Structures are given as C-alpha cells and as structure tokens.
Design a protein with these regions (language model features):
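Extended, low-hydrophobicity, polar/charged segments
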Residues: 1-181
C-alpha cells in the first residue's frame, strides 16, 4: 500500500490498526474492494468543520454519511446517504422518491447509533447492515481519496471513492448531493 498524504495526519493501513475502528467497520474491512487507511484524531475534532480546521484536510476531500429514515404505510426503511462535505443530501426530494417513501428525514441520533453500532459523528457506510440501501453521490464515487468516519469519533478512514461506490447495497445516485445554501 502506498503512503497517503492528506492534511497533517499520519495515515496507516487500516487492516493493521483495527483497534482504531468501530467494531462493525473492523468486521467489514476485509470485504472492501480496495485499500483503506486510518488516522487517529482528537474526538472533539470529529465533526467535519472542526476536522478540516484541525487537520488541514479540505472539505472537498471529505464525505459525510447521513442516516435517513424513510416512511411509507407505517413501515420505516433506514438508508445511508454519502455526499461530499461541501454538499447536503437531498433527503426530502430525491432520496424520498428513490426509496418510494411518503416521508423521509434524518434518522434520530439514538436510532442511527443503535442500528449502525457506530458512534454518532463517526458513522460511515463501511460496516452498515447489509439490508440498507447506501446512496452515493457521483462526486463521491469519482473521488480519488476521501475521508469518512471510522465508526468512532477517535479516528477517520481514507478510502478511494470507487471503493465506497462498490460497498454492499451501494447505488450511485445522480443529484444526491446538493450545494449548501
């Protein structure tokens, strides 16, 4: 694995440092279609704005994973949306229609944490339940190397966009990421 240079962090092969990952992420790592690196961070800097300020990683090299609850006829479907940190997921429009839901919104924090087994602020598409749709913005899929959560607030993963787009349940969805107003 070639060394990764992204911001001021020291990136290490994730497969050699499973202790830095959330349990579901560590379990899913062997199934990835490509490489992943991990870097330890201060837990207080896990949120995107604080992370980019603290470590000099541009927001354009970061992808956010949001958990969405889509409802129709009393049934709730959970899904993940993966968009660049410079955009927001079109949850109420495109995501709602794509999932065939009457209503879609961000899943409550307690639900997102319980259903993913990951820490809030560290939720990542790697290691999500296999039944979940993982909607990926084309800009994420095309990214050379993107920073995503690691399942904990104490580290981040760097993963090629193509690896994220090849995750189980992943579907590249044009128009998912919308410019932030």
């Amino acid at each position: 694995m070639t060394a990764v240079q992204l911001g001021s962090l020291t990136w290490l092969p994730a497969a050699d440092h499973l202790e830095l990952l959330g349990a579901p992420v560590a379990a899913a790592l062997p199934g990835l279609s490509g490489p992943a690196w991990v870097a330890s961070i201060d837990e207080g800097s896990a949120d995107t704005a604080a992370f980019t300020d603290a470590y000099g990683v541009p927001a354009t090299a970061s992808a956010n994973c949001v958990v969405v609850a889509a409802r129709r006829a009393g049934e709730t479907t959970l899904a993940a949306c993966l968009v660049l940190a410079t955009t927001r997921a079109d949850v109420n429009g495109l995501v709602r229609r794509h999932l065939g839901a009457r209503k879609a919104s961000f899943a409550p924090q307690d639900v997102a944490v319980a259903e993913t087994g990951m820490a809030y602020g560290g939720i990542t598409p790697i290691g999500l339940p296999a039944s979940w749709p993982v909607l990926v913005d084309p800009a994420v899929a095309a990214g050379e190397l993107l920073v995503v959560g690691s399942g904990t607030r104490g580290s981040k993963l760097a993963v090629p966009g193509a690896v994220l787009a090849a995750l189980p349940g992943a579907e590249v969805l044009e128009g998912l990421g919308q410019p932030v107003d």
